Design a protein with these regions (language model features):
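Hydrophobic anchor residue at the start of the ABC signature
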Residues: 153, 374
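ABC ATPase NBD Q-loop/coupling interface
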Residues: 65-80, 295-318
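H-loop/switch region of ABC-family ATPase nucleotide-binding domains
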Residues: 198-200, 420-421
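Catalytic Walker B motif of ABC-type/P-loop ATPase nucleotide-binding domains
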Residues: 164-168, 385-388
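Conserved ABC ATPase signature
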Residues: 139-143, 147, 360-364, 368
Length: 452
């Protein structure tokens, strides 16, 4: 009996005009399956059928057959499926329950009634598999986005599910974190767990995958696991203004969340027409630096200087910025606040969002939400743009739109600082690379070397 079996499966979200899944036929019974496809193709929707969130939480109209671990998903309560189906969401920030790392990993085991001794062993094993034993006593609120992704996987692995479902698990991870997560995933599969992984950075997963599936238009077709990897984008044409002025400066800045310093005595500056890429391991202080430049996190010592003008800040979790009924009204709201002319249609086209302009941002895929939030913060031509992991959940077309947007910002005399683990983005747009580590900053050049 296949672990996962879908036949003529179709699904439509509440009030949606078209199907998100449109006749999926699929059987999988072992190993690691990689699920690829453009943003909005139906990947997250298909994954949410696996643990019963569709239809039991999201509602909507579902038809056909969906069986997981020999259970009828349409008729089986989500709580029953959760015992055997481990799920890691696109937004790990929303998955943590307890304020401490160790307690959060133990949460699922507590619900299963696992004995304390066995619980402690499983928690320790899961932390070790994900390479986060050193975070055991940390508060969840102090973790970076990548560290939270590894925490979410540890909590799921501790429950030893029969089916592991991961939605963009590598989106915020540095190379070390990606290697640790893929190693943990491989160990779980070798131990008999079946895994279904949706991932845009598919080249990282391909060598370990037993099969590859492509989603398009709500349907699934096989693709070769050893198929071609999307080439790196060419270096964007970026003509900076002839004269560069100071955009922002940190003078002997020490900074960190909750009064705990993670950056020490930094002296950094950025000029107009410049795109600075911030690189470094998860937890190295990239988000702290962005928030300090933005004025959202006062420095513990030192001073911050900013050129007058509007600052646009995109956090790691784009959902924090999206509160209005449609994508268009999100952009219109920014334009009204900045007294800019109505460029909503142009911005929607530039970011590839015209087809979802009247959709609720909360109903979009992760990559589409990322683009919607980016369009909203860029509307009104800000003078300083600060982006935290902007390629999270983005497909190739969305990355190209982001690259073009950053080039436009620099070309009109603005400046940008981008925290990223994406070497392709660094190679495409960065005029300077600043690597963070051990609380200090190092400028890395040439760009080709920094992007490796």
């Amino acid at each position: 009996m296949p672990t996962l079996s879908f036949a003529r499966l179709h699904y439509t979200y509440p009030e949606a005009a078209s199907r998100a899944l449109d006749g999926v036929d699929l059987e999988i019974d072992f190993g690691l399956t990689l699920l690829t496809g453009a943003s909005g193709s139906g990947k997250s929707t298909l994954l949410r059928v696996c643990n019963g969130l569709i239809p039991h939480f999201h509602g909507g109209v579902i038809g056909g057959s969906a069986r997981v671990l020999d259970r009828d998903v349409i008729r089986t309560p989500t709580r029953e499926l959760a015992r055997d189906v481990g799920f890691v969401f696109q937004d790990p920030e929303l998955q943590a329950v307890y304020p401490s790392v160790e307690r959060d990993v133990a949460f699922g085991l507590e619900n299963l009634g696992v004995a304390r001794g066995e619980m402690l062993r499983r928690v320790g094993d899961a932390l070790e598999m994900c390479g986060i034993v050193h975070l055991r006593s940390r508060a969840v609120g102090t973790l970076s986005g990548g560290e939270r992704q590894r925490l979410a996987l540890a909590g799921v692995l501790a429950m030893r599910p029969r089916l592991l479902v991961l939605d963009e698990p590598l989106s915020q991870l540095d190379p070390e974190g990606s290697a640790a997560l893929l190693g943990a995933l491989h160990a779980a599969v070798q131990g008999g767990t079946m895994a279904l992984v949706a991932e845009h950075r598919h080249h990282l997963v391909l060598e370990r995958a037993d099969r590859c599936l492509l989603m398009a238009g709500g349907r699934v077709t096989p693709c070769a696991p050893d198929g071609p990897v999307q080439p790196a984008p060419a270096r964007a044409s970026q003509d900076a203004p002839a004269s560069s002025e100071l955009s922002w400066r940190l003078h002997q800045v020490t900074a960190g969340p909750a009064g705990v310093a993670v950056l020490h005595d930094l002296d950094l500056a950025g000029g107009t027409g410049e795109v600075v890429a911030l690189t470094g391991a998860n937890g190295s202080g990239k988000t702290t630096l962005l928030r300090t430049i933005a004025g959202l996190l006062p420095p513990l010592a030192g001073s911050v200087e900013r050129r007058p003008g509007r600052i646009a800040y995109l956090p790691q979790n784009p959902s924090a910025l999206l509160h209005r009924a449609t994508v268009r009204t999100e952009i219109d709201w920014t334009l009204r606040r900045t007294h800019a002319a109505g460029r909503a249609d142009a911005m929607l086209e530039e970011m590839g969002l015209a087809a979802v302009a009247e959709r609720d941002p909360r109903d979009l895929s992760s990559g589409q939400r990322q683009r919607a939030a980016l369009a909203a913060v860029l509307a009104g031509s800000p003078s300083l743009v600060l982006l935290d992991e902007p390629t999270r959940g983005m497909d190739g077309a969305a990355r190209a739109a982001l690259t073009a947007a950053l080039v436009r910002v620099a070309g009109r005399g603005g400046s940008a600082v981008v925290a990223t683990h994406d070497p392709q983005l660094v190679a495409a747009v960065a005029t300077r690379v600043v690597e963070l580590g051990d609380g200090v900053a190092r400028v890395r050049q040439p760009l080709a070397e920094a992007a490796r």
